[in-house]
Amino acid sequence: YTACDSMTFMFDIAGSLLYTNYGDAFGTRNRANGNLEYVTLQFPIWRRYIAFSAGVMPYSAVGYTFTLADSLGSDYHYSMAYNGEGGFTQVYGGLSFNICDWVALGANIYYMFGSITQSRTLSFTESSLNTVAQSDNLTINSLRLRYGLQFFHTWGNHTVVLGGVFENRQRFSRSEYMQVETTTLDTVSTLSNAFEMPMVYGGGISY
């Protein structure tokens, strides 16, 4: 962030639109999907020594519906449905510091929130058989930290930059529900630390 000068203010927004045609043996369907990719801004706080950046970025999105109807012989007719919806979004803010002429140190704090629900339903046309449904819900509401370190050196018309980032792994909770009767919803389990973001580390060099 500190690479921007004292007169710089950057604002960036991006979106996407996807039009898709799906087809199988039973027919075709056209779908249009759009998404806000990110909104970010960046500006210096004090000359070229301290700079700030913030933004909103969707992290992931889920959206699908599949159905299948079949029968077991001529006596039992059933349908299966698979649904998924939701997503995660992260809001971040970051500071960077030029601690000397050739070293910069920075950190981003991310607030990630959202939920993803995936369900499976088996239903029968015969009233003597109960509908069975299972729903998995993953909810995230947590903070993450990512650190960065950068070394740079300039001589004449040449500049070499060496950088690295690190983020420790973060664990989240997961809830699972199962519905056995069409009118009864039972919580089977709530699992702590059942999902985690992996440790992140990386580096790069530019000339």
Residue spans of the language-model regions?
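Subset of outer-membrane beta-barrel
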Residues: 1-207
